[in-house]
Amino acid sequence: MSISLTESAAQRVSSFLSHRGKGVGLRLGVRTSGCSGMAYLLEFADMINEDDTVFEDKGVKVIVDGKSMVYLDGTELDFVKEGLNEGFKFNNPNVSSECGCGESFNV
């Protein structure tokens, strides 16, 4: 089981954590939402819970709760800039379909 970050994503997360001044890492998860069933969660973590799995890649701790791990295993988090837009992108090998707007997915 693993979660990885591109160099671009690791730099962006490190920058956010540095400016924030606190936090142990980046928490990734999934929740039920959208027209395809699930949506990604991405937030800063101030603590690690008992059921969390912790990965470290390129100096960044990535924290995933036990329920989300089955959906996120093998995912690579990237940070992309496309024109005037920029943001994090999940490259998830478990996804079988995505909704048209790209906000939700199914496995």
Curated annotation (Swiss-Prot):
Requisite cofactors: Fe cation
Q: Which residues bind Fe cation?
A: C35, C99, C101
The cross-references to InterPro entries, in alphabetical order and at most eight, read:
Fe-S_cluster_asmbl/transfer, FeS_biogenesis, FeS_cluster_insertion, FeS_cluster_insertion_CS, HesB-like_dom_sf, IscA_proteobacteria
Pfam families annotated for this entry?
A: Fe-S_biosyn
Q: Name one GO molecular function term.
A: iron ion binding
Q: Which family does it belong to?
A: Belongs to the HesB/IscA family.
Listed under subunit, the entry gives: Homodimer; may form tetramers and higher multimers.
Record NCBIfam families = iron-sulfur cluster assembly accessory protein, IscA, PRK09502.1
Q: Write down the HAMAP family for this protein, in alphabetical order.
A: Fe_S_insert_IscA (MF_01429)
The protein's name is Iron-binding protein IscA
Organism of derivation: Photorhabdus laumondii subsp. laumondii (strain DSM 15139 / CIP 105565 / TT01)
Q: Tell me the gene name.
A: iscA
